[in-house]
Every structure is written in C-alpha cells, then in structure tokens.
Amino acid sequence: MMVIRSVERSDVSALMQLASKTGGGLTSLPANEATLSARIERAIKTWQGELPKSEQGYVFVLEDSETGTVAGICAIEVAVGLNDPWYNYRVGTLVHASKELNVYNALPTLFLSNDHTGSSELCTLFLDPDWRKEGNGYLLSKSRFMFMAAFRDKFNDKVVAEMRGVIDEHGYSPFWQSLGKRFFSMDFSRADFLCGTGQKAFIAELMPKHPIYTHFLSQEAQDVIGQVHPQTAPARAVLEKEGFRYRNYIDIFDGGPTLECDIDRVRAIRKSRLVEVAEGQPAQGDFPACLVANENYHHFRVVLVRTDPATERLILTAAQLDALKCHAGDRVRLVRLCAEEKTA
C-alpha cells in the first residue's frame, strides 16, 4: 500500500537517490546530502514548533508500506520570502506610441517582482519514474491539500507553486541562456545548485533591476516563457484542475510558470470533510478513488481508497487503518481524488 507520511531523519539516503533522478532543474531537491539533511531537520523542527514562521516548512514522502521503499517527495513552505527575498518575473506590457508618427507598440516586458512574499508554497514535488503509475502522482501532489485543510491556521491565504520550466536532458535552458547567463556568468546547473543549497545572496547582487523587453531575448527563449518541462505538464494539469491559475509570473532561472490560488478555493481543501471510520470489509462497487487522511499533526498519513465520496461512515480494512495510524471511531478527512468531470 502506498502511504504519504511525514519525513524522518532516516530518509536522507532515499532522498539522495531521488535527487539523482531529477535531471536538474528541481532547485529544492539538490543531490547534496548536507542540504537534504538540513531540510529534513528543518521540517522536524517545524513540526516541533521550534521555528519562526519565516523558516517553517513541511516535507512528506510517499512510501510503499510493504517494502519501505521511498518513491517520492513533496513539501510545503509556510511563508516564502520573509527571510530571503523571493523573486520571480511578472510578465507585463510597456506601450511605446507616437501619434505623430502613427506608431503604437505594446511590448511584452519582464518586471522583477517580490509580489508573492508571505505566500505558502507547494514545492519539491518529485516521483521516481519507476513509480509513475496507479495514481501515485495524484496522491503525492494532492496529499498536501489534506494537510493544509486539517491545519488551515498554519498557512497563509494564498498558495503558489513554481512549475519547472523547459530544460533539456543536458541541463540546457533556453531562457537562462538568453537572459540569466548574461548577468550571472555561470551555467544554469551551477546557479540552480547554488540556489538549491541555500546560497541565494548572489541573486539579489546580480539580478537585473530594470524591466527587460522580451523581444531582446532569443526566439527560443521567448517561446518557453510560462511553459513547463514536458515531465511537469501532468503536475501543472493536476493543479489547474484544483483551481490554480497562471497569473503571468515566471521563474527567474528557467522561465517556468508560477501558479497560484486562494487557499480556501482549492477544490480538495474546500470539498474535504471529516467522517467517522470503522473497521470492516469495504463495500464492493465502481467507486472513485478518494484521498483519506488522518488528523494527526505529528504523525500525518494519507492513503488512496476506492469508496463513495459522499459516505458518512467510512469502512476501512485493518491494514488501511494501520497505515493511517487510526482506530475505529476516529474521524478522518475524505475527499474525491479528482474533480468530477462536468457533463454537458
């Protein structure tokens, strides 16, 4: 059975293995053991209530309960940009016009922005390619909404998610090559690594402070603004079906889109509800997949089950109850895994 659980110190070697499979571009999952250990420690201190809001972050892993294999990772930053500035570009427009010459040009322009300061962030989503099956990606991504719904007071009103931009298998980023490299004088992989290991001071020191006309970039770079890496397209679709939207903000390194949503408008958060759980043999039928989560802050768990999402009393097997760290009579959070398709 696949289970989402809180990260533990013993997970560091498994996270190193996952990091080695990302192919670069996932800034918050560098293949650096010291950085990953520090990330785990920060998550544990967050759960223990030892950190200020500006440093809080939760990390979860997807585990095969039978073998102990860690197949994926996902995380939530509680409030970005309160310690180190959180940069992105806002894609806007500057108009240059002359009535006398009968010239009017509306030019797409990149403006350096800190507009998402204080927002909660969905981040560090990565599923081992060998495990991309049977709803694991949905479980991994959406489990965070169950945690946010259960502990709403821990998070801010807006949630953002930076989507991985277009980078090839050799680490080549058209956006970086045309823009970032001119100011940072280093390869994309080097800048990405520095950022992922917490060495972010160089961004503020070297970033261009003035608006940038996108027409000055290569056509290849212009074409990838707001576009996602092919492997990230499913993750973008998942978030958009939950209510997230692209509002013309992009990553400063690879040009990937930043999606955002008001936390209380996220479908899985808005529609999740508490039901009583009982032990038994679940009813057979053509039921949809549903997320089921406990309400245990320190030992949070999420699993996928097929059940009636409208049920008032959820029947689970002993194995499912054990995976959730629950007992009969406890209340669990339930929501349909995917939004119902609208019919004409």
UniProtKB/Swiss-Prot annotation:
Catalytic site: H229 (proton donor)
Residue pairs linked by disulfide bridges in the UniProt entry: none
Source organism superkingdom: Bacteria
Binding locations of succinyl-CoA: L125
Gene3D superfamilies in the cross-refs: 2.40.40.20, 3.40.630.30
Record InterPro entries: Acyl_CoA_acyltransferase, Arg_succinylTrfase_AstA/AruG, Arginine_N-succinylTrfase
Biological process, per Gene Ontology: arginine catabolic process to glutamate; arginine catabolic process to succinate
Pathways involved: Amino-acid degradation; L-arginine degradation via AST pathway; L-glutamate and succinate from L-arginine: step 1/5
EC number(s) per entry: 2.3.1.109
Catalysis performed (reactions): succinyl-CoA + L-arginine = N(2)-succinyl-L-arginine + CoA + H(+)
GO molecular-function term, one example from the UniProt record: arginine N-succinyltransferase activity
Keyword Acyltransferase carried by entry: yes
Protein purpose: Catalyzes the transfer of succinyl-CoA to arginine to produce N(2)-succinylarginine.
Family under the similarity heading: Belongs to the arginine N-succinyltransferase family.
PANTHER family: ARGININE N-SUCCINYLTRANSFERASE, N-SUCCINYLARGININE DIHYDROLASE
Protein's recorded name: Arginine N-succinyltransferase
Organism name: Shigella dysenteriae serotype 1 (strain Sd197)
Taxonomic lineage: Bacteria, Pseudomonadati, Pseudomonadota, Gammaproteobacteria, Enterobacterales
